[in-house]
């Protein structure tokens, strides 16, 4: 879980607090973001990257570039990689944990 991953990263020194969260769709559907074009989407949410991606309607917003963290050793077998491939993205750059995908 995200909490377990955070405990590893922060060596168990975390405090759990409940907050209200919104999906990207909920944020982008607000009036001031209507018809908003996303050129570059950078997601760094300490292990919750897939949840964030699942909260975006890719068919509507179509970000040109998406940067996400993938911690699995075999990138092409990760859930996030396959999620983005299925949304018509290709991997164009990989760092240690950060990976950049481009819309086809």
Region spans (language model):
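Glycine-rich adenosyl-binding loop in Rossmann-like folds that engage adenosine-containing cofactors
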Residues: 1-22, 26, 31-33
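Conserved acidic-Pro-Pro-aromatic motif
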Residues: 27-104
